């Protein structure tokens, strides 16, 4: 049997004024990824699946984010905000192209899963014409109740319109919906705005489907999965739920998190086998950590690639563009940026390595910095394999340190150093015999007695 195709419409036109943010609501991040990106990543994305995103007229950045995450996304603009059904019909052109299953979701529900989208479609294959996603609310106050009789959805009753018996229902409307594509436009066009706000409500689709003599049904998911994000407090709650998911998934894959609740991961973090993450580590977007690597406490990583059995920290900061080879070591109070550090190289302490390539097994002494910025442009430092950079050295880029070369401690290197050479740049040390005693004696003669 040929697989059914689908169109998912994600509504992302809301203003999000309660977020008190200059960002459109759906661009606020959870686990290093925008709310919208989480939803788009979970939505069906096979060869027979299409995606449409409805945005507000002043939110081009939302459309840009949608295209970044899903290049196949079609962007539609809701010129006026006149309700959820009106928002869906902003994508009328996409609906008119036809689909077996029409899915409707919201861009501010980052915890929804691909599995839930798949389950939402199943009743459409078994005779239902409309499926609503529901959840059992710990406190249903304010939610629309899902009225079910004989296993079929008969109504979505808003709090103000619910009877005393209906108010006892804890099964609530999550807003996410699937409609048989053959009737979708007909149903949506029948939704009116004869209500106090004069808006077109998607929930009215249930009554229209039943009036057509068709079946509406419900599937359930957890309350956490359908949390809508409208405030910064709710954003923090979603972050907590997402971090728990990510930590559990990492440990299930063989990662050792010594104190899981203190480790923060990004949605796209990838791990090899036998990775160890010590307490109080923050991993931002774009990080991959290979087999056997250890990330020590109080380290921060973003857009970095960590090789097998490499070590990072404690108190290290790996900024975007950092790549550690197998067995490389980044120690305490080291910062790297746009740095390729090859296998076995060591940068053990108190060092800044930026816009640099460090060859295999090179050793970078404490206090070394690559002086990569001249106030206008960034410049690169090349350090050859097996090179030894003495402590407290400044390497003024652009500069190359040859394979096996040595740089004496305290040097300021401004010229290339040949392979196997020693480069030393410092003033000649002098010692003045008796100077310290003469200095102390002079100070003692001129010092006033302290008052008691």
Curated annotation (Swiss-Prot):
Q: Which reaction does it catalyse?
A: alpha-D-glucosamine 1-phosphate + acetyl-CoA = N-acetyl-alpha-D-glucosamine 1-phosphate + CoA + H(+); N-acetyl-alpha-D-glucosamine 1-phosphate + UTP + H(+) = UDP-N-acetyl-alpha-D-glucosamine + diphosphate
What keywords is this UniProt entry annotated with?
Acyltransferase, Cell shape, Cell wall biogenesis/degradation, Cytoplasm, Magnesium, Metal-binding, Multifunctional enzyme, Nucleotidyltransferase, Peptidoglycan synthesis, Repeat, Transferase
EC number(s) per entry: 2.7.7.23, 2.3.1.157
Q: How is the cofactor bound?
A: Binds 1 Mg(2+) ion per subunit.
Q: Which family does it belong to?
A: In the N-terminal section; belongs to the N-acetylglucosamine-1-phosphate uridyltransferase family. In the C-terminal section; belongs to the transferase hexapeptide repeat family.
Sum up the protein's function in the record's words. Answer: Catalyzes the last two sequential reactions in the de novo biosynthetic pathway for UDP-N-acetylglucosamine (UDP-GlcNAc). The C-terminal domain catalyzes the transfer of acetyl group from acetyl coenzyme A to glucosamine-1-phosphate (GlcN-1-P) to produce N-acetylglucosamine-1-phosphate (GlcNAc-1-P), which is converted into UDP-GlcNAc by the transfer of uridine 5-monophosphate (from uridine 5-triphosphate), a reaction catalyzed by the N-terminal domain.
For this protein, the record's PANTHER family field holds: BIFUNCTIONAL PROTEIN GLMU, NUCLEOTIDYL TRANSFERASE
Q: What is this protein called?
A: Bifunctional protein GlmU
The species is Rhodopseudomonas palustris (strain TIE-1)
């Amino acid at each position: 049997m040929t697989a059914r195709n689908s169109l998912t419409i994600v509504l992302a036109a809301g203003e999000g004024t309660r977020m008190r943010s200059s960002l459109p609501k759906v661009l606020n991040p959870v686990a290093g990824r925008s709310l919208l990106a989480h939803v788009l990543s979970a939505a069906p994305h096979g060869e027979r699946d299409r995606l449409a995103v409805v945005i507000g007229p002043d939110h081009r950045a939302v459309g840009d984010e949608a295209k970044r995450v899903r290049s196949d996304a079609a962007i539609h603009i809701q010129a006026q905000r006149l309700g959820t059904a009106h928002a869906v019909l902003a994508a009328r052109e996409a609906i008119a192209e036809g689909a077996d299953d029409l899915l409707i979701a919201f861009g501010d529900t980052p915890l929804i899963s691909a599995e839930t989208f798949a389950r939402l479609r199943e009743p459409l294959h078994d005779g239902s014409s409309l499926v609503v996603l529901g959840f059992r609310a710990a406190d249903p106050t304010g939610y629309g109740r899902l009225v079910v009789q004989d296993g079929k959805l008969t109504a979505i009753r808003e709090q103000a319109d619910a009877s005393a018996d209906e108010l006892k229902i804890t099964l609530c409307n999550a807003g996410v919906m699937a409609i048989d594509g053959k009737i979708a436009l007909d149903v949506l066009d029948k939704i009116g705005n004869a209500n106090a706000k004069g808006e077109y409500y998607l929930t009215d689709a249930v009554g229209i489907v039943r009036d057509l003599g068709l079946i509406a049904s419900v599937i359930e998911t957890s309350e956490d999965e359908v949390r809508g994000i409208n405030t910064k407090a709710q954003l923090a709650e979603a972050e907590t739920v997402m971090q728990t998911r990510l930590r559990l998934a990492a440990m299930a894959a063989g990662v050792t998190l010594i104190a899981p609740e203190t480790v923060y991961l990004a949605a796209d973090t990838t791990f090899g086998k036998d990775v160890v993450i010590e307490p109080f580590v923050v991993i931002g977007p774009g990080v991959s950590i290979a087999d056997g690597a250890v990330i020590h406490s109080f380290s921060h990583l973003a857009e970095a690639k960590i090789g097998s059995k490499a070590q990072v920290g404690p108190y290290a900061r790996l900024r975007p563009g950092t790549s550690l080879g197998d067995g490389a070591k980044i120690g305490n109070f080291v910062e790297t940026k746009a740095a390729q550090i090859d296998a076995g190289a060591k940068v053990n302490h108190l060092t800044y390595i930026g816009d640099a390539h460090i060859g295999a097994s090179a050793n970078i002494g404490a206090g070394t910095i690559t002086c990569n910025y001249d106030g206008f442009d960034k410049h690169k430092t090349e350090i050859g394999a097996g090179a030894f950079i003495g402590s407290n050295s400044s390497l003024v880029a652009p500069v190359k340190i040859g394979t096996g070369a040595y740089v004496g401690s305290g040097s300021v290197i401004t010229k290339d150093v040949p392979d196997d050479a020693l480069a030393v740049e410092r003033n000649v040390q002098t010692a003045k015999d008796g100077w310290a005693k003469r200095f102390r004696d002079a100070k003692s003669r001129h010092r006033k007695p302290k008052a008691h």
